[in-house]
């Protein structure tokens, strides 16, 4: 008979086995005031009478004492009864609304199809299809997007003043080259400063009756209407 050697075990505290030398700080201890607050929060409702009744001296007793009321029982939530089959005792059934089965086809609950309105097996035009589940209506179409705004394109054109009043009694003098005015500056911030520059060009153009405009027709009308003491109706333009 072979004797088996018995292994000897040394008794070690369990804390030494799970101790981590890398932890430099220990978990914070709770103060006694915090422990009392936690114990009070753990007591939700007292639902049993204390056997010591008035002689009980514990302030944190979890049982009811004389003068304390029993907590009210929570009311069960009313669950919606979904009837999926017709009652086979429709004519003889006396349960009425409490019957778990339907007494009319309108009471039968049909679960919704997981594919929703995208189901390809649903019927069309109020005709039954292969799918026996209910299908919601498709969402309404999104409103059409507004048309893009038309950008005002700048045009380069020349106009000639054919009937322009004289300036200070002098006849207009024709120059070799006509000044060029750019009216696309109306949307910029320094409008007043540039307006004075364009105004001087307009006065210069009056001398030779011809001017080249770089901008839109609407901008040209605005610049003439903005000038004080000027009436655009007295100008005649040939484009």
Swiss-Prot record:
Which Pfam families is this protein grouped with?
zf-CCCH_2
**UniProt entry keywords in alphabetical sequence:** Metal-binding, Repeat, Zinc, Zinc-finger
Report the PROSITE patterns cross-referenced here. Answer: ZF_C3H1
* Zinc finger C3H1-type: from-to: 44-68, 81-106
Q: Give the species.
A: Invertebrate iridescent virus 6
In this chain, composition skew of type Pro residues spans 135-147
Q: What is this protein called?
A: Putative zinc finger protein 132L
The UniProt transmembrane annotation reads none
One MF term from GO for this chain? zinc ion binding
The segments labelled Disordered in the record are: 20-40, 128-151
Instruction: Locate the compositionally biased regions of type Basic and acidic residues.
Output: 28-40
């Amino acid at each position: 008979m072979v004797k088996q050697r018995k292994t000897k075990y040394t008794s070690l505290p369990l804390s030494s086995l799970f101790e981590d030398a890398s932890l430099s700080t220990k978990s914070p201890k709770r103060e006694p005031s915090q422990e009392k607050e936690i114990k009070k929060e753990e007591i939700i409702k007292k639902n049993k009478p204390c056997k010591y009744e008035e002689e009980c001296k514990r302030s944190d007793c979890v049982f009811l004492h004389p003068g304390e009321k029993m907590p009210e029982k929570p009311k069960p939530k009313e669950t919606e009864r979904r009837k999926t089959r017709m009652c086979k005792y429709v004519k003889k059934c006396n349960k009425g609304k409490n019957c778990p089965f339907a007494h009319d086809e309108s009471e039968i609950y049909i679960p919704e199809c997981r594919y929703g309105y995208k189901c390809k097996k649903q019927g069309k035009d109020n005709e039954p299809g292969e799918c026996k589940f209910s299908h919601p209506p498709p969402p309404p179409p999104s409103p059409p997007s507004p048309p893009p705004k038309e950008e005002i394109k700048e045009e380069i054109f020349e106009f000639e003043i054919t009937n322009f009043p004289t300036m200070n009694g002098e006849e207009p003098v024709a120059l070799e080259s006509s000044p060029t005015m750019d009216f696309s500056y109306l949307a910029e911030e320094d409008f007043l400063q540039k307006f004075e520059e364009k105004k001087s060009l307009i006065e210069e153009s009056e001398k030779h009756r011809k001017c080249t405009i770089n901008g839109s027709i609407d901008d040209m009308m605005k610049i003439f209407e903005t000038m004080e003491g000027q009436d655009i109706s007295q100008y005649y333009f040939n484009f």
